């Protein structure tokens, strides 16, 4: 039987991604009003254990995956960078083979995407990318779920990304051809998306429009998306903020988007840097629904990976 890893969006078929989102919507509706610790009907992952490895600190990823396993009737074990580091002391491949003997699936939040790929190649259980320097596929599934939940039809929609063409942007680029939306990306030249990701989208016949101003990218967009300008470990933070400041999402920028446009941000947010408080705390913002939907999207991802 083929092992179902969830490392990136682009290798999956559109039908598989659609099925994951449909199940996420259905599971969320099925437990509306329930206590958060109540197990889903049928306990789909009863007896299953997820190992969670964190090389990077986390709030939403850690809590959402742990609660996902609890609600599905399973359990989780967490190891941080203080407990272990991939490739140090023991090879990534050996770690993957050992953990495969103990647990049913592994979620990794890592510094280097290549480590996650090497881990998955050696593992005999499903491996999920919880975030790497290259991509953040679980986040994008939650984002798309949130947009659908608020009435947006993805096919034919125009989404705009402004700021740093980072790992989250990369996963939106991968998702565009799979779900049929176009993506306008507004970044400074030095923070433009990786050419490899643009080539992936081109091969999948996705529409990705690149701009050097936020205003051009946002014009007429149904959704405006931002992310932090400075992440953990970034050097020369002051210079980054200076270069990216013209890409901050303000009320004035949102006025250039389509009527009723929504705002997304995967959090944590820095009000006054990449987004103004009036936007992220205003009526267009879906950020807390987006954060909650990490739980529901990841439950569906776990069930898809484990064939449950």
Curated annotation (Swiss-Prot):
<dbReference type="InterPro" id="IPR006130">
    <property type="entry name" value="Asp/Orn_carbamoylTrfase"/>
</dbReference>
<feature type="binding site">
    <location>
        <begin position="231"/>
        <end position="232"/>
    </location>
    <ligand>
        <name>L-ornithine</name>
    </ligand>
</feature>
<feature type="binding site">
    <location>
        <begin position="266"/>
        <end position="267"/>
    </location>
    <ligand>
        <name>carbamoyl phosphate</name>
    </ligand>
</feature>
<keyword id="KW-0055">Arginine biosynthesis</keyword>
<dbReference type="GO" id="GO:0006526">
    <property type="term" value="P:L-arginine biosynthetic process"/>
</dbReference>
<keyword id="KW-0028">Amino-acid biosynthesis</keyword>
<dbReference type="InterPro" id="IPR006131">
    <property type="entry name" value="Asp_carbamoyltransf_Asp/Orn-bd"/>
</dbReference>
<dbReference type="GO" id="GO:0019240">
    <property type="term" value="P:citrulline biosynthetic process"/>
</dbReference>
<dbReference type="GO" id="GO:0004585">
    <property type="term" value="F:ornithine carbamoyltransferase activity"/>
</dbReference>
<keyword id="KW-0963">Cytoplasm</keyword>
<feature type="binding site">
    <location>
        <position position="167"/>
    </location>
    <ligand>
        <name>L-ornithine</name>
    </ligand>
</feature>
<dbReference type="GO" id="GO:0016597">
    <property type="term" value="F:amino acid binding"/>
</dbReference>
<keyword id="KW-0808">Transferase</keyword>
<feature type="binding site">
    <location>
        <position position="109"/>
    </location>
    <ligand>
        <name>carbamoyl phosphate</name>
    </ligand>
</feature>
<dbReference type="InterPro" id="IPR036901">
    <property type="entry name" value="Asp/Orn_carbamoylTrfase_sf"/>
</dbReference>
<comment type="similarity">
    <text>Belongs to the aspartate/ornithine carbamoyltransferase superfamily. OTCase family.</text>
</comment>
<comment type="function">
    <text>Reversibly catalyzes the transfer of the carbamoyl group from carbamoyl phosphate (CP) to the N(epsilon) atom of ornithine (ORN) to produce L-citrulline.</text>
</comment>
<feature type="binding site">
    <location>
        <position position="294"/>
    </location>
    <ligand>
        <name>carbamoyl phosphate</name>
    </ligand>
</feature>
<feature type="binding site">
    <location>
        <begin position="136"/>
        <end position="139"/>
    </location>
    <ligand>
        <name>carbamoyl phosphate</name>
    </ligand>
</feature>
<dbReference type="InterPro" id="IPR002292">
    <property type="entry name" value="Orn/put_carbamltrans"/>
</dbReference>
<feature type="binding site">
    <location>
        <position position="227"/>
    </location>
    <ligand>
        <name>L-ornithine</name>
    </ligand>
</feature>
<feature type="binding site">
    <location>
        <begin position="58"/>
        <end position="61"/>
    </location>
    <ligand>
        <name>carbamoyl phosphate</name>
    </ligand>
</feature>
<dbReference type="GO" id="GO:0042450">
    <property type="term" value="P:arginine biosynthetic process via ornithine"/>
</dbReference>
<comment type="pathway">
    <text>Amino-acid biosynthesis; L-arginine biosynthesis; L-arginine from L-ornithine and carbamoyl phosphate: step 1/3.</text>
</comment>
<dbReference type="InterPro" id="IPR006132">
    <property type="entry name" value="Asp/Orn_carbamoyltranf_P-bd"/>
</dbReference>
<feature type="binding site">
    <location>
        <position position="85"/>
    </location>
    <ligand>
        <name>carbamoyl phosphate</name>
    </ligand>
</feature>
<dbReference type="Pfam" id="PF02729">
    <property type="entry name" value="OTCace_N"/>
</dbReference>
<protein>
    <recommendedName>
        <fullName>Ornithine carbamoyltransferase</fullName>
        <ecNumber>2.1.3.3</ecNumber>
    </recommendedName>
</protein>
<dbReference type="Pfam" id="PF00185">
    <property type="entry name" value="OTCace"/>
</dbReference>
<dbReference type="GO" id="GO:0005737">
    <property type="term" value="C:cytoplasm"/>
</dbReference>
<dbReference type="InterPro" id="IPR024904">
    <property type="entry name" value="OTCase_ArgI"/>
</dbReference>
């Amino acid at each position: 039987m083929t092992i179902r890893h969830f490392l990136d969006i682009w290798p999956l078929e559109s039908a598989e991604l659609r099925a994951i989102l449909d199940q996420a919507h259905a599971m969320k509706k099925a437990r509306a009003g329930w206590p958060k610790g109540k197990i889903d009907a049928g306990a789909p992952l009863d007896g299953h254990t997820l190992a969670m490895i964190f090389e990077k600190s986390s709030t939403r990823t850690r809590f959402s995956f742990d609660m996902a396993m609890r609600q599905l009737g399973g359990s989780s074990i967490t190891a941080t960078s203080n407990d272990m580091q991939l490739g140090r002391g023991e090879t990534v491949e050996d770690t993957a083979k050992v953990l495969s003997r103990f647990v049913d699936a592994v979620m990794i939040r890592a510094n280097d995407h290549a480590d996650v790929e090497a881990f998955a190649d050696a593992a005999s259980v499903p491996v999920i990318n919880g975030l790497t320097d290259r991509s953040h596929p679980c986040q994008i599934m939650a984002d798309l779920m949130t947009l659908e939940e608020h009435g947006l039809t993805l096919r034919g929609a125009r989404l705009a990304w402004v700021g740093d063409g980072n790992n989250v942007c990369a996963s939106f680029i991968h998702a565009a051809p799979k779900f049929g939306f176009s993506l306008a990306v507004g970044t400074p030249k030095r923070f433009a998306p990786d050419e490899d990701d643009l080539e992936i989208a081109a091969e999948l016949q996705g529409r990705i429009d690149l701009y050097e101003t936020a205003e051009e990218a946002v014009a007429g967009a149904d959704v405006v998306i931002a992310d932090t300008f400075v992440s953990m470990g970034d050097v020369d933070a002051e210079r980054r903020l200076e270069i990216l400041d013209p890409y901050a999402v303000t009320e004035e920028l949102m006025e250039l988007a389509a009527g009723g446009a929504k705002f997304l941000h995967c959090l944590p947010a820095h009000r006054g840097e990449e987004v103004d408080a009036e936007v992220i705390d205003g009526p267009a913002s879906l950020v807390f629904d987006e954060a909650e939907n990490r739980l529901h999207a990841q439950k569906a991802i776990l069930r898809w990976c484990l064939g449950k």
